[in-house]
Structures are given as C-alpha cells and as structure tokens.
Amino acid sequence: MRKCGEDFWLHSRFLRKYKKNTIALFFCFSLTFLLMTVLLILLHTNFLISDLQAKTEFTPSDCYIDGLDNAQVENLRTDPDISWIAIEQGEGRIYTRNNQQAYLIRGDELSATMMAGVVEGRLPENYGEVAVERWVLLNLGIEPVIGQTLLLTDFENGKEEEFILTGILSDIYANKRYGLMQMHTGMEASSTESLLAYIKFKDQVPYNEKVAELQAELEIKNDSIKECPARTNYRSLYVLEAEIIGVVLIVCMVVFYGIYRIMLLTRLPQYGMLRAIGMKRKQLTQMVLLELYEIFFISVPVGTALGIGAAWLILRISGDMDQHIFLSGERAEVQLTIPWLAIGVCILITGGLVGSIGLVSASRAGKQRIIEIVRQKNGGKKRTKNSFSIDNAQSKNGMILRMGGKYLVCDLKTMCFTVLTVCVGVMLFTGLAYKARTLEYYRNDTRELSYLNGQYAMTMLHYNRTDQGISRENAEIIAQTSGVSQVRTSSSLPVRVIDNKAVGRNEEYYDELYERQMEIYGYSDAGYDGKDQVYKSFLNGYNEEALRCLKPYIVEGDFDPENLKDNQIIVSVLRMDQRAGGGLPGPYKEGSPMMDYHAGDEIQIKYRNDFRTDTEEYENFSDTDAEYTYKTYKIAAVVSFPFMYDCRHTVYPLLITSDSYLKTISPGSAIQCMYLDGDPALSEQERNELEGTLIRLGSENASISTRSLIDEIERNEMFYFKRMVYITGIALVSLLLVIMNMTNTLRYRMQTRTKEISMLRAVGYTRRMIIKMLLFENCAMGAVGIMLAFILSWPVLKYLHSDSEMLAFGHSFVFESAGFLIAAAGALLVCIVLSFRVPAEWKTRRIADGIVHVE
C-alpha cells in the first residue's frame, strides 16, 4: 500500500462520499462556534455597557480621597501611575431660585464632566461661571440659553450672587434618578477649604498596592481612601465567562459525540478493509484525525464570522450602539467588543476535546479484530431478553412491541446516548425558560426598587415638615394636566413612634446607627424625649392608586386600598438579606426584619399639635414643652417596600395610611412625592412638552425636583430585552444541535437493521406496522430521557434560584412546569416525526435490495 499522500486522499474521499455525516458534523462545529462567539462577544460587550452605566452613577474613578490640601493634590498630579485626577473644593453650597434648591459644586473642569459631556457652550474656567444640566435649568425657571446672567440666592446668608451660564451639560443619570440639582463652577483661588480628589489609575496598576503606597506618601489614615463602587471588576466577568463556556462545551460535545459516533460506526467496515490490506493503526488514527480536523478548521472561520455578525445584529437591534453615555467629557461609544483571546481559548479547548474523542475512537477501532470490523460487529454483544421473545406475543400489536423492545436492548449504547441527548435538550430548555422567568422578575423588581415607578417624578431631596412640598391645590392642577393618565401621591407627617421594647429588632445595626449619629449630629433617630422612649418615623398618606401598588409587597396581613380604615396602618419594614451575609438593610421579602412587627399588632405614635417639626429641639428630643397628640393603630399589613420614594431613607419602620385620613389629621399637609404616567398615545414631542409643563408647575412649590424618567425606564426594559434575545438565541441553536443529533442517531438505528426489516416486510410486515414499532422505540427512549430530565432539573433549577436574588425579594422556588412541558412535548414530537421517516430500502419495491443490504 502506498503511504505518501494516500491517507489524505482516502480521508477526503470519505468526506465526499458520506456527505450527510460530513454536513452534520460541519453544522455541529459551525453552530458551536457561532454560539460561543455570540455569547462571548455579548458577554464582554454587555459587561462594558454595564460598567459604563455604573460609572455614570458612581463616577468613572477608581477611588476618592477627601480632606486633602493643595500640596497633596500636586503630589498626586505628578504621580506617573495616575491616569487622571478630578478635584472638588470644599462642600457644595446651596443656592435657591424659583423656590428650588441647587448645589453649587466648585471644582476643576474634569470634576464637572466625569459623568457628563458639554452639549452646548463650554466648561467654566473661573468661579462665577457655571455649567448646568438642562433639566436643572428648567426646574430653576431658567431658559437654557448660553451667555445669560443668573441671579441665585445663597441659602446660608440670603445674599444674591451673579453667575454666567457658559455651558449646558448632558443629563447625569444619578442626579436625574434621585432629583439632585447641581451646578458646576470653577474653584475659588483664595479658598483654603479642603479638597476632594477623584483618582483614576492607569491600566495594569495594582489597585491595593497603589492605595497602600498613596497612604504612605500622603500620610493619611488607612480608611481615608475610599474605593469607587463602579471600579471595574473583571473577576465577575471571568467567572461568568468560565460558566458559560463550560455549559456550551458540555452541550455541544454531547451533540458532537453523538453525531461523530454514528459517523464512525458507519465507516467501520471500510476501516476494517483498509486494515486488512495493510493499513497500520497509526495510519488509521491519522486518517480519522485528518477527517475531523479538516471539517473542524473549515467550521472555525465560518462559525466565528456568523457569530460576530449575529452579535452585531443583536446590538444594532437592541439600540445599544445608539446609547448616549458621557464620561470624562466625551461620549463613550458602545462598540462591539470581540474577545479574541477568549474565543481563541475556546477554539483550542474545543479542538483538544474533538481530537481526544477522535483519538480514543480511532484507538478503539484499531484494537478490534479485523474480521469483526469488516462484519460490523463493532465489538458489541447482541443482547436479548426472554421478556421480548416473539413466541410470547398474543397479538399483532404485541409482536410489534416485543420487536421494538428487542431492538432497544440490542444496542444499549446507542439507546443510552439517545436518552442522554433528549435529557440534555429538555434540561437545557427548561433551565433557559426558568432563567427567562427570573429575568422578568428582575426587570419588574429593578424598575420598582429603583423608583422608576412613573414616567415623570416630582420628589423632594429633604423635608422635615408636613407642609413642605407640593401644595394640595397645585397637586390637583398637576393631576388634571392634559396628557397625564395616572397619578400616585404620598404625603408625610413626621411622627414619633412609642418604642415597645417587646418588639424584636436588629440590635446590632441600630446600636451602630445610634453611635454613628451621636458622633456626627449629637443626637439620634431614637431616644427618650422626656416622656417616652421613641424613634422617629413618618406617617405617610397614600392616594388610592399608590395604595394599590403596595399589594405585591405584602409580607404579612392584607388591606383594602379602597377602604383602609382610620384605625388601620400599613407598616413598611426593611430586612437584612441573609443570603448575602448581612450588609445594608433593603426592601427584601425574605431575611431578618429590622423590627419584628406583625399584622394584628398595635402600634402607638404621637405627633406635635402645631406640626413644627423643623426645629433642632424636635430633632434632639428637647422640645419637652410641646403638646403632642397620641394615636394607636392596628397593623393591617406588613410590606417590604414603600413604593413611593422616601428621600429621608428611613431605616426605622415607615407607617402608611390613606391620604384622606392624613388630611383629617393635618389639613395643611403637602405632597412630598408624585409619580405620573403620560397618555400612551403621546408623541415624543408631546411628551417633552408635558415634561416642560410639569416642571413649570412643580417649580411653583419649594424644593420640588421634577424630571422625566422615560429614558431610565427604557434602559431597564432594553436590558431585559437583550437578555431575552440571548436566551432565545441559545435555545434555538441548542435546539438545532439536539435535533441534528437525534436525527442522526435514530437514522443510524434504522439503517443498521435494514436487512432484518426487509425480511420482516417479505413475510408480511406492513409499513404501518414498522412505523408503530419505531414509534414505540423512539417514544420509549424519549419518555425515559424526559423522566431523567425531570429528576435532574430540580437540583439545577434550585441552584439557579439560590444563585439569583429571587428568594430575597420574595419569589419562592417554583418548578418551571410550563417550560418543561413545552420541552418534553417538543422532544416527543421530534421522536414521532422521525419515526415516519422510513428508509427507502424498507419500502415494498426495494425489499430485495434491503435483504442483501451491506451495512
């Protein structure tokens, strides 16, 4: 036998002759690389987008240092490891105009544009020049026209100051989300106030080591350097990357092995003949690997290119590339991030696994006796069971079932692999369906817990009297404004709650809070006021629409939003997320409550008769001569989240009643929070006009911040949409791979028995009887795979549940029945459809060809 070039010629001939197997393997590899490439690109691109969005809220710096002097700042500016540094001078000063309050931030140019860009004009160069966001100008009653002089009143001394508007900044996400109005100006040259420095290190600079070095150089305390919450953390990306690659490799290798095993078994007789005429085992192994890798190397560029194209299309459809994100004064372009290194590693790992499978398979084939390979015994043992003996058949259908059972156990390896394929496919689809459900919960929770509870928000940054906020007359005008469809309101009355020591609480947290507040303010939110042991809270009056929105957050008890009695109260209690190991209290449904109130308990409050709660005497519990009214309520329900924005961020329980009842207690109370929705039929121009109208109406009341949250809501919706696209894409590609594997496996099972089936057809078996037998076999394997998937899906879904935040927010584990049933029905449907694909050799006119068929 010729050795040079002959192996290459033979393996190419095999690839051309067995086109179906070659095409199946090509599609398997191509879809694998397509799936890997899409997932890796989208994972890295989304990580970039999430990182950019976090930086728009928490600054793009790595850390910040407060309390510096000019010499220390100059030392930082000359540090070669620092990429940039932004400086702010002293504390923000409060200025008022148009009944609104805005903070004046003194700093360098970079401090103004860390999270924004200049939309129009220029940045301030000196103190007295200002750059402001457009929505802030509108709230201050100022038209956004560059070059005009602004008259603002200093909140501290009441003096008017002139400022020149030199620039208009893009919206800063955090400011708009919480209603914080800021103006940026230059630093005062004569000021001796301390400086705040935001620092960004150069790439590859080790963070912890550099922080320790700066602490020593600047001679500051260990805790003086604070890490920015949005500092890029690649570790989470790499962990998620490894998890995704692992899952994809497992699924794709299972499918590949199924297809390749059939391909190998089909060619074994030819391999046996080659061995018989002198081919060595090593040559056989080389030829097998050449076949595999020729398909593999053609599939790599095809699958990768298709993956890049699919990822680009998804990002284009999702609108990510059109996002306007400004950082460090420039628009941060969202571009396709192709992780070539990760893709290359995946290709190498896949190539190694493919080669290992091919090497092991070729070695096994080479070790078999040549005569067995030629006769296609494949080293296997024919397995028969007495229970499937045809002699025991009582009817024609009984004989069909027994024949099907006999064929099932004759080739246990193929049967087991078919069952495994069905199991993996059903489990994967069920897991993806469950992940889709968790994403829907996450979307809703994120929207509500981020206070994106209305298209327009009118809130306060701070209040300490019940008559501060939107007057009720003005609130009525706002609610009746053309274009407004829904209104939710909250009015608050500062109260003191009689502290019942019998009520359990998080003693450790409240003790730390008490010490911290005493150190900073000299008083705390809890203490003895001369008559009672109390803690400060608020009695919030919600309108009927806002009360309805509380229903999903009920932890215990119940209430009627339309008929909440005057002696009933709803208590909003924060909890500690035990799964996260403590941390800060949050609006969790599960976990340890900050105070252990229950539905049916009584709670007593008291409030000042004159409602003068904006004095220092009230805050430090020294107003012993004031008159108070006592009220006792019965807790109707305990909720985990107050829904309406609490700008005071109260960690003690909030008390909620109906707005109509609160008005009877305090007729002069105002509205501190309003959420409004516009008419769905409004155009973009009409929505902008409505925003302007609401800003004008809101500015008629002191300290009210009015803004549109439509962009923020759409951002949250887009995040959900993208994730659903990924899940759908994974499901479709995986479905194609599983169907391809099942088709090849079941077709192989039919081809290997062509001779026997043709003999049965010759003695009277009809095509319908053969199809019945195949239906029994395929559906039996499918049913076993489905049952196995049902058993294994429970721990997998429970892991997904525990790994998410669903439990913390009150979403208990529920098996994904709908997704499982759809996957099971789909698997059985594939088994049924493939049962009707009878080979041509089994047809009546080709029975003779089938009897002499060489497999």
What is the role of each PLM region?
Residues 44-231, 437, 441-727:
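Basic-flanked hydrophobic alpha-helices used for secretion and membrane insertion
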Residues 302-345, 363, 713-722, 769-773, ...:
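Short helix-loop junctions at transmembrane helix boundaries
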Residues 21-25, 31-59, 414-416, 424-453:
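Alpha-helical transmembrane segments
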Residues 18, 254-296, 737-780:
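Interfacial "coupling" helices/loops that link adjacent transmembrane helices in transporter permeases
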Residues 2-6, 364-385, 752, 841-855:
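Short cytosolic juxtamembrane segments of multi-pass membrane proteins
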Residues 231-246, 250, 273-395:
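Hydrophobic alpha-helical segments
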Residues 13-20, 282, 286-303, 307, ...:
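Alpha-helical transmembrane segments of multi-pass membrane proteins
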Residues 1-34, 47-50, 289, 382-426, ...:
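N-terminal Sec/SRP start-transfer signal
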